[in-house]
């Protein structure tokens, strides 16, 4: 098996980092510093729900969620695609360029990277992504660029689709045979004494949920991470961007958060 340090690394960027230029600058600065010394290829996948929420509020349109997924009426998908594949993607690309990186803004559709189909008619223009052809993305990586990929995709019929960013990152990682890190404001899963749990499988997570160690919104995050590990067929990591000094360790293949193990 290839050493994790040699596999490409897909970083799904979420949480408040997307709206904080200082946090983004620390992340991109760490990537630039790391890639001056090492050859590991890194890909960013992002959502941008906060931008969509702001846009919906300005347009006085309701935000409706079902099972944690944004309901996206087909007449609203051009607006949401504009916010995610347009504004959010270009803001991230601009920050990366300002921090010395050769950043390329992409979507799930570019080069056939991910195939996208409608997930559930009741959700509207919400798609499920599956791994596609990574050859164009690999060419971009081989050129030394940092791909920044929005979670907007296209169906085979050319219909715009909004894909959950975690699920999009799993599909991108699958296409690239890459390691996956979900990077957010959550450092990982803590035990009852506030110590970081280094790894979790479904059985261990169920026991912690039953014991009220994992509660509330963290339950959703844990189940989503375990589902991502199962879909990808390898361990994934949930870690935080809050400690920039740890990021280069993460890029080098060290665990700095909680590893979620597939069944």
Swiss-Prot record:
NCBIfam families according to UniProt: argB (TIGR00761)
GO cellular component, one term: cytoplasm
Binding-site list for substrate: 48-49, 70, 162
Matches recorded under InterPro entries: AceGlu_kinase-like_sf, AcgluKinase_fam, ArgB, Asp/Glu/Uridylate_kinase, NAGK-NC
Described function: Catalyzes the ATP-dependent phosphorylation of N-acetyl-L-glutamate.
Source organism: Vibrio vulnificus (strain CMCP6)
UniProt site positions, description: Transition state stabilizer: 12, 221
GN (gene name): argB
EC number: 2.7.2.8
SUPFAM superfamilies, per the entry: Carbamate kinase-like
Taxonomy of the source species: Bacteria, Pseudomonadati, Pseudomonadota, Gammaproteobacteria, Vibrionales
One of the GO BP terms on file: arginine biosynthetic process via ornithine
Catalytic activity: N-acetyl-L-glutamate + ATP = N-acetyl-L-glutamyl 5-phosphate + ADP
One GO MF term attached to the UniProt entry: acetylglutamate kinase activity
Top-rank lineage group of the source organism: Bacteria
Protein name in UniProt: Acetylglutamate kinase
Pathway the protein contributes to: Amino-acid biosynthesis; L-arginine biosynthesis; N(2)-acetyl-L-ornithine from L-glutamate: step 2/4
Homology family: Belongs to the acetylglutamate kinase family. ArgB subfamily.
Coiled coil: none
Cited Pfam families: AA_kinase
Keywords carried by this UniProt record: Amino-acid biosynthesis, Arginine biosynthesis, ATP-binding, Cytoplasm, Kinase, Nucleotide-binding, Transferase
Cellular localization per UniProt: Cytoplasm
PANTHER family, per database record: N-ACETYLGLUTAMATE SYNTHASE, N-ACETYLGLUTAMATE SYNTHASE, MITOCHONDRIAL
